[in-house]
Curated annotation (Swiss-Prot):
<comment type="pathway">
    <text>Aminoacyl-tRNA biosynthesis; selenocysteinyl-tRNA(Sec) biosynthesis; L-seryl-tRNA(Sec) from L-serine and tRNA(Sec): step 1/1.</text>
</comment>
<comment type="subunit">
    <text>Homodimer. The tRNA molecule binds across the dimer.</text>
</comment>
<dbReference type="GO" id="GO:0005524">
    <property type="term" value="F:ATP binding"/>
</dbReference>
<keyword id="KW-0030">Aminoacyl-tRNA synthetase</keyword>
<protein>
    <recommendedName>
        <fullName>Serine--tRNA ligase</fullName>
        <ecNumber>6.1.1.11</ecNumber>
    </recommendedName>
</protein>
<feature type="binding site">
    <location>
        <begin position="243"/>
        <end position="245"/>
    </location>
    <ligand>
        <name>L-serine</name>
    </ligand>
</feature>
<dbReference type="GO" id="GO:0006434">
    <property type="term" value="P:seryl-tRNA aminoacylation"/>
</dbReference>
<dbReference type="Pfam" id="PF00587">
    <property type="entry name" value="tRNA-synt_2b"/>
</dbReference>
<dbReference type="InterPro" id="IPR042103">
    <property type="entry name" value="SerRS_1_N_sf"/>
</dbReference>
<dbReference type="Pfam" id="PF02403">
    <property type="entry name" value="Seryl_tRNA_N"/>
</dbReference>
<dbReference type="GO" id="GO:0004828">
    <property type="term" value="F:serine-tRNA ligase activity"/>
</dbReference>
<feature type="binding site">
    <location>
        <begin position="274"/>
        <end position="276"/>
    </location>
    <ligand>
        <name>ATP</name>
    </ligand>
</feature>
<keyword id="KW-0963">Cytoplasm</keyword>
<dbReference type="InterPro" id="IPR045864">
    <property type="entry name" value="aa-tRNA-synth_II/BPL/LPL"/>
</dbReference>
<comment type="similarity">
    <text>Belongs to the class-II aminoacyl-tRNA synthetase family. Type-1 seryl-tRNA synthetase subfamily.</text>
</comment>
<comment type="function">
    <text>Catalyzes the attachment of serine to tRNA(Ser). Is also able to aminoacylate tRNA(Sec) with serine, to form the misacylated tRNA L-seryl-tRNA(Sec), which will be further converted into selenocysteinyl-tRNA(Sec).</text>
</comment>
<feature type="binding site">
    <location>
        <position position="297"/>
    </location>
    <ligand>
        <name>L-serine</name>
    </ligand>
</feature>
Length: 438
């Protein structure tokens, strides 16, 4: 959430920066709400001043033994007006809050201008895509002999799900363990196990609500045995997490952290659940875009002056997984028009997918600035001992399913077997090759 003082101070400058990312700020709507708020506050202050003045008169009249009933009646009337004014102010403040919650973050000045992913800027590329001397198979065909089953998953749950058994399930598990071990043992993250179901306050804190509710899986929780209709206001909405970023970042919601406790660095392996509401017809084959997928998430909670240094470090941490797996990748900085809602700057890491003959996103690393912290009221005590908003960062380290796809396709052999990357062999009992079932 943006600082409302930024809008009050120079809304045109904020609107111009937001326009760079394709968002049109409702300047007139904000101005109208601000004018209404000011009018109500002015009227409230006038009523309070009048009530205070009359209260003094009552004291003086009573001190003289004179009748104060008329003045007391006027004070009572003012009290009713103040209650009505407070209610009006609550409504306007609520509308202002709703507007603020719907506004995306302002891009950092270092972010390149652009309208779509076509204008993202490559910052580095590592590894050379392998030249195959046999017809390349995609991960769906390769995985069929290794225990990857989309048909039975469709029977169980519908489209965009997968069942993994045998060798491919072991490889999937090995990848997640390898990622966690690398981040905790080499990159300084603390491993965390977090809930996969969170409340609405947590989703608001990291920015999924209210704007992106259609992308989430909602889990209503009823009070007692009543139906949802009978329960009415007693139904509390919970949500399956779309990423472990949500519970990890919310660890500091409504907290004031000691300055010397920063930075905080967490890593968690979790399933992620997304409805993919806006992705109809995209990546319908295979594991690239699923309703349920595993991911190792990195979150850093830092002091403001260190957040961009932390972003660079986090991006290198994600890249390091691909380096160790010896997978070709490239890193791009997202342009203003391709950035996520809460980000002030984002790097995407894309891995080479041979069957598609292109690079596909496998990680996004973002600096959210104080955008999430303001929503969560997450603060730290600065050197002067005063509470100050934290900066939060998050990044995929990595998406396990997409990494599995990349390993299967880049390490495939002509006979349909898959060579296990050297970095993963300790997690598979030294096994060097995954062979398809006869």
């Amino acid at each position: 959430m943006l600082d409302i003082q930024l809008l009050r101070k120079d809304i045109d400058a904020v609107a111009a920066r937001l326009n760079d990312r394709g968002y049109e700020l409702d300047v007139a709507g904000f101005a109208a709400l601000e004018a209404e708020r000011k009018a109500i506050q002015t009227r409230t202050e006038e009523l309070q001043a009048r009530r205070n003045s009359l209260s003094k008169q009552i004291g003086m009249l009573k001190g003289k033994g004179e009748d104060a009933s008329a003045v007391m009646a006027e004070v009572a009337g003012i009290g009713d007006e103040l209650k009505a004014s407070a209610a009006q102010l609550d409504v306007v403040q609520g509308r202002l809050q709703d507007l603020l919650l719907s506004i995306p973050n302002v891009p950092h000045e270092s972010v390149p201008a652009g309208k779509s992913e076509a204008e993202n800027v490559e910052v580095r590329r590592e590894g050379t895509p392998r030249a195959f001397d046999f017809p390349v198979k995609d991960h769906v065909d390769l995985g069929a002999g290794l225990g990857l089953d989309f048909d039975v998953a469709a029977k169980l749950s519908g489209s965009r799900f997968a069942v993994l058994k045998g060798p491919v399930a072991r490889l999937h598990r090995a990848l997640a363990q390898f990622m966690l071990d690398t981040h905790t043992q080499e990159h300084g993250y603390t491993e965390a196990y977090v809930p996969y179901i969170v409340n609405a306050a947590s989703m608001r804190g990291t920015g999924q609500l209210p704007k992106f509710e259609e992308d989430l899986f909602r889990v209503p929780r009823k009070m007692g045995q009543a139906t949802e209709a009978e329960a009415g206001e007693h139904v509390e909405n919970f949500y399956l997490i779309p990423t472990a970023e949500v519970p990890l970042t919310n660890l500091v919601r409504d907290e004031i952290v000691a300055g010397d406790a920063l930075p905080m660095k967490f890593a968690a392996h979790s399933p992620c659940f997304r409805s993919e509401a806006g992705s109809y017809g995209k990546d319908t084959r295979g594991m690239i875009r699923q309703h349920q997928f595993d991911k190792v998430e990195m979150v850093q909670i830092v002091q403001p002056e260190t957040s961009f240094e932390a972003l660079d470090a986090m991006t290198h941490h994600a890249e390091n997984i691909l380096r160790k797996l010896e997978l070709p990748f490239r890193t791009v900085v997202l342009c203003t028009g391709d950035m996520g809602f809460g980000s002030t700057k984002t790097y995407d890491i894309e891995v080479w997918i041979p069957a598609q003959n292109t690079y596909r996103e496998i990680s996004s690393c973002s600096n959210m600035g104080d955008f999430q912290a303001r929503r969560m009221q997450a603060r730290f005590r600065n050197a002067q001992g005063k509470p100050e908003l934290l900066h939060t960062l998050n990044g995929s380290g990595l998406a396990v399913g997409r990494t599995l796809v990349a390993v299967l396709e880049n390490y495939q052999n002509a006979d349909g077997s898959v060579t296990v990357p050297a970095a993963l062999r300790p997690y598979l009992g030294g096994q060097a090759v995954l062979k398809p079932a006869a």
